[in-house]
């Protein structure tokens, strides 16, 4: 998070100091082997953006992660052994006033073998005010209104899992 702040020319601790008690989530995801042609709408993980601040993703060598470029095309994100994929989430996009953009991505396992991935997502403290004006010259140039981290994350979580109700 320090590197993000430094690249924007703001206090290197601007984001870090808001992560004393961060909201963190982790997942291990299993994708079964595919032995037949996939339909156009069949996904391991449907197209989405990460709603939090920052996600670190490890994927095995099977592949299947695709990201959407600015032209709307899906591009394969080939696994590179010994590396992690760093995803900017929607919350960091808001906080940075769109300096950093969250990228739509999806997973389609087209292989006849199992696929695994692991992720860890970090967000600031629950009560942190996500205010893009910290990177703006003035409040009027902020693209988003301030919002509390926990309120935002819970609203996105509820939206994603609305079928629970």
What are these regions (language model features)?
Residues 1-165:
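C-terminal flanking tails of non-heme Fe-dependent oxygenases
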